A protein has these predicted regions:
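Short, intrinsically disordered terminal tails adjacent to the first/last structured region
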Residues: 1-9, 164-192
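Solvent-exposed soluble domains appended to multi-pass membrane proteins
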Residues: 287-690
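Canonical alpha-helical transmembrane segments
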Residues: 58-76
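Alpha-helical transmembrane segments of polytopic membrane proteins
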Residues: 47-60, 127-139
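Membrane-helix interface and helix-disruption motif detector
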Residues: 39-51, 73-75
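Juxtamembrane "helix-exit" motif on the non-cytosolic side of transmembrane helices
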Residues: 32-45, 92-97
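N-terminal secretory/membrane-targeting segments
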Residues: 19, 23, 79-163, 173-176, ...
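N-terminal membrane topogenic signal
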Residues: 6-26
Length: 690
């Protein structure tokens, strides 16, 4: 209850408390939410120190300064709306990070139409403790009646002391106060008087609000840009121009700054960034030329399987750590274990995906280029030109088909597959959903129907199949849960093991169908995993494997996927332990088919060239060459990364990894420039090739 003896100056001060108190409360609450997000990232070398708090506060001030230009009522409404919007952004980033270990970018938002399709995957990432993000909303709802009552009391006392109320019957005063009940309208009441005085007072109030807002903007920019400049001129030098992980940018700019920079980067790419110089383009061409020459090895395996059909199966979330493993005495992947005996099994094969996940694996495996640091090539640059497996094989007389029992628009596949040269893309509309499972059709029926479609096509063919049944959140109907996962029962890790066991059974049926249809002896069958399972809890892997794990162990587990290549005659079977990656698949298959990639714009190595030390670079900047293994720090500093010996698994001096790191960063930059600037089209036009 405010004392009725308060004069007009006191009530003006009270209005200032409302205006600036609500603004400071907004800053405090939003900083808490940013801190809550940060505390759930658990990223090495990413700490929220004092300067990071300063950046956060400055960014919030720069984003909200304009609310101080409004009336008190308008300001409070604007702050509530801004609170809701920023909370939605922060929480969306947290959910996205739980699955992708990354933040949302603008290219990802352009794929927002796919969110509805994710369904249970998103639900599984929601935690009850996340309700803390809405705690301030609950307080506002509960406290609103009290605040409203206080506002009316303030307005009533203002009316009683205003010139307009002088001489009025006391019974009329409440009516006036009802009309002007809200505290924000006090300014209007206080301004009543001679017209000139009223206008002068309003003008002064607007000048004060404008000045305060601009002062907050200048201060906010100073608090945010100052520390960022300090970082980028010292330990984070070159960060904003390099091809770094989003976490590295976040560590310097803060969350809001990261999103501002992401918008700038997107606009630069699409509205018109700095063009590449002729010298830069020549350097890129020279790199591709040298890489092509190193791949062009004409040994006994070159062309050994010329004219063979090719079936490539990209298996959802199939990771390498389960191959050959048992749980409760039962093999998790019995059919893949059997296939391994007659196939080339690459036990140190790495997925090289980024934010595009499945679409990135598709792109890297078929185009032998790195995915983008932000978004997916499929959705951003589907109209650009690439040297891809389906088109290259079509140029030599093959027919090319893609199979995926899901919506053709997902990941913009229909448009991308047309650009890649596929003769036909069989999507969900082309399948009978007679085995509904997970996202769509179960893999067993998917393989059966896909092979039936292939039987009607001419040979030789290139067939690219994408499975779905082992997709997050790994839910199987009870009748398909045939693996006893023991103590993992009821956990998502246990569900994942069940899902992979089901997919393994589907692969076993595929092999038998190929034999029955006469395809086994004239087809190269390639099976690999597209990416990890997004389950990062180290304790589950240690429990499953029965041993403690190091940082290097976990890095390999989360980045290695199996690769099986079964050749028509079963030759060259065995386990290959050299490090290889998804970029290496296309040039290696072309080598077996006798098609040179010397003049192709590909970045991958030829797995059959006899070199045991191919450099495999991941999108994060991690790399291995079978001798050294480098794990980067999220802060982007080379010196804060860790260099390991592959032979011993022990940490070695960081300088031993410097030369390879320089090459790794160069490759990522060349690939990004090639994709973004559509350089392959430009280079081939210059060379007179179609």
């Amino acid at each position: 209850m405010i004392d009725s003896s308060l004069g007009l100056p006191a009530r003006k001060r009270l209005l200032s408390v409302w205006r600036y108190g609500s603004y400071l409360l907004f800053l405090y609450v939003m900083v808490l939410k940013l801190w809550y997000l940060h505390s759930h990232l658990h990223a090495r070398y990413i700490d929220m120190n004092r300067l990071d708090f300063v950046i956060a506060i400055g960014s919030l001030m720069a984003a909200s300064f304009w609310t101080l230009w409004l009336s008190v009522r308008g300001q409070i409404i604007a702050l509530i709306v801004l609170d809701v919007l920023l909370t939605a952004l922060i929480y969306s980033d947290l959910i996205y990070y739980r699955y992708f270990q990354d933040f949302i970018t603008l290219p990802v938002l352009l794929q927002a139409g796919q969110v509805g399709e994710l369904g249970d995957s998103i639900k599984s990432l929601l935690h009850w403790t996340d309700l803390r993000f809405a705690a301030d909303w609950a307080v506002m709802l509960i406290g609103f009646p009290t605040l409203k009552g206080i506002s009316r009391r303030i307005a009533l006392r203002t009316v009683k002391t205003s010139p307009l109320s002088e001489g009025l019957s006391p019974s009329l005063v409440p009516s006036l106060s009802a009309v002007r009940s809200a505290a924000p309208r006090m300014e209007r009441i206080e301004n009543i008087g001679p017209l000139g005085q009223k206008r002068s007072l309003r003008f002064r109030q607007r000048v004060v609000r404008a000045s305060n807002g601009l002062a907050v903007l200048v201060l906010g920019l100073g608090l945010s840009i100052g520390p960022i400049k300090h970082y980028t001129s010292s330990w984070a030098q070159g960060l904003l121009t390099g091809n770094y992980w989003s976490m590295s940018l976040y560590n310097v700019t803060g969350l809001l700054g990261f999103h501002v920079y992401d918008v700038y980067r997107f606009a630069k790419d699409h509205i018109g960034g700095d063009p590449l110089s002729a010298e830069q383009k020549q350097d890129i061409q020279d790199w591709f030329s040298q890489a092509g020459q190193s791949r062009d090895v004409r040994n006994a395996s070159f062309g050994a399987y010329q004219g063979s059909n090719v079936i490539v199966i990209q298996t959802e979330a199939l990771m390498n750590f389960m191959i050959g493993r048992k749980i409760g005495g039962q093999e998790v992947t019995p059919n893949l274990n059997k296939l391994r005996e007659s196939s080339l099994y690459f036990s140190n094969y790495y997925h090289q995906t980024g934010q595009g996940r499945t679409s990135d694996a598709d792109f890297s495996s078929n185009a032998s280029l790195h995915p983008l640091p932000s978004g997916s090539v499929f959705t951003r640059f589907a109209d650009h030109q690439f040297d891809v497996l389906p088109q290259i094989l079509k140029d030599t007389g093959y027919h090319a088909f893609a199979f995926h029992a899901y919506d053709s628009s997902f990941w913009n596949r229909l448009a991308m597959y047309q650009s890649m040269g596929y003769d036909q893309f069989f999507s969900k509309k082309d399948y009978l959903i007679d085995e509904p499972l997970g996202w769509s059709l179960g893999d067993k029926s998917f393989f059966k129907q896909s092979l039936a479609k292939l039987a009607a096509e001419q040979q030789p063919f290139y067939s690219f199949m994408i499975t779905l049944s082992s997709h997050h959140p790994y839910s199987l109907p009870e009748k398909e849960q045939t693996l006893d996962v023991g103590s993992f029962e009821g956990t998502m890790f246990g569900d994942y093991l069940e899902a992979v066991h089901y997919v393994d059974g589907a692969i076993g049926e595929l092999v038998e169908l190929m034999k029955a249809q006469g395809l086994w002896d004239n087809t190269i069958l390639c099976i690999y995993g597209d990416h990890d399972n997004s389950l990062t809890g180290q304790a589950d892997y240690e429990k499953f494997l029965g041993r403690s794990l190091t940082e290097l162990d976990m890095h390999k587990i989360m980045n290695q996927v199996p690769l099986f290549i079964h050749l028509p005659d079963g030759k060259m079977a065995g386990t290959y332990t050299e490090a290889e990656g998804q970029l290496d698949l296309a040039p290696s298959l072309l080598h077996l088919l006798g098609i040179s990639t010397a003049a192709k714009y590909m970045m991958g190595s030829n797995m059959f060239d006899g070199n045991p030390n191919h450099l495999v670079v991941l999108r994060t900047g991690a790399f291995t060459d079978s001798r050294l293994h480098y794990i980067p720090s999220p802060d982007g500093l080379f010196e804060n990364g860790t260099c390991y010996s592959e032979a011993s698994g022990e940490q070695v001096g960081i300088e031993q990894c410097r030369a390879e790191n320089t090459e790794a960063q160069k490759r990522l930059e060349i690939s990004d420039q090639t994709v973004t600037y559509d350089l392959i089209k430009e280079f081939e036009q210059q060379n007179g090739t179609p």
